[in-house]
Amino acid sequence: MPPELTATTARWLVSEPGRELVRRITAALDAGRDVLAISTDGTVRRAASDPERLAAAVAAGVARRRARERHLDADEWLFTREALEQASDPTVSSWRARRYLDAVVVDLCSGVGGDAAALLATARELVTVERDEGRAVLARHNLTVAARRLDVGTPARTTGDGRVRVGVGDALAVAGVRPLDDAPTVAAGQPGASGGGPRSDFRTDDRLVHVDPGRRVGDRRTQDPMLTQPPVDALLARHRGAAGMGIVLAPGVDADHPALRGAGRDRDVGASPAGDDGTAGVGAMPDGGIEVEYVQLGGTLIEAVAWTGVLRDGTARASATLLPRPDGPGAGDGEIHRLVRRGARGPRRPIGPVGDVLVEVAPAAIRARLHDDIGERLGLHRLAAHRALLSGDELPRDPWVRARPVLAVIRARPGAVRAWLREHAVGPVEIVTHGVRVDPTTFWRDIGRPPRGPHGIRIELVRRDDDSVAIITDDAAGWHGW
């Protein structure tokens, strides 16, 4: 597949004429002009001088406006549409970067520099590697902007003379990575050739590694760590000489997936069993030596991260993190919360009837298999063997749960729910399903199309072990911990 942005066009885009055109296009979009009108404007077309530059500048302007919602330096950064879609939320990137404090860090699959900008604030020295040269060019520009704001050294044009070094190459072949702007091919024995010269700056042995591999297979996202690009088992094998690794994964990954527990690491990627320097590295640890952290931002489960070596939280096997959203508390009290599981999951809570309160546990804790621990601490029981829903008789106030008073438990039939609604004066209604194969919109029509909206009455259709019920809860009187 051809790159979204060629290196030649990227170099023009980061030049003063390219940046000025992106500023003009962004201002025109801000003023309400549409993309077609801008793209056919004679002065814009002349400034771009060719169709590829024009398309890149317009795409960068559109992406910049979208990036403003999350990125502090959006009005100076340069994105492609795809790169922006793939970029981590800056709040999450900053959380990840905390583990790399004052370290020499190699950021693989670095894209246009979103994660690297966060690492720039914590690392002592930073090396980035990106296979797509066009993206690497944008990354150097974006990191220069970030470095200026942070008042740290700016990315060097070649290796060896700056706090940040930007390289072009494959995450599984760091010996072949070349500094950005070096010639693509370097003769053996010359500076930058494999085995000598500046390329040694891109090694990962004894360093801390950060990598956010591609998680798309065709046009679909994958939860399977064996299908990422590069695959997780290949990354662990190739960089087993690293002091520690952080590999960003899809939020639905299983913490006990074989690729994360030592299986499938004999893939032939040219790595020695003990790393490039002969020392035992992250790939040689018993039981995989991996902590899988599930990160939730506000009410949304964002990602999982596999941590190895010195980056692992002691003996943690799985952990859950609640991050508050910058524009709202999101985690109950606006603070960061963490829970850690250091061994096998604890015993499941007993199954019981629907109590006075229905309790939902934060998705990050559920993925980390910590919901039963939370239930035990709060004195709650399960409603079904294969549901993470909990229940009890008192409203818990805990950052890891959302709890709602139960108003009624009735049959999960539209007629029964419609009859209950006729007998009770209620505000807006929200319909949610828990394991029940029902289309909420169809169910809403079948119960008489009551007013819809959040923070009112919730009709919770729950699949239990032997039947399904409709649990009517009062969201307005509930506790919203996350």
Where are these regions (language model features)?
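SAM-dependent transferase fold signal centered on methyltransferase-like domains
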Residues: 1-482
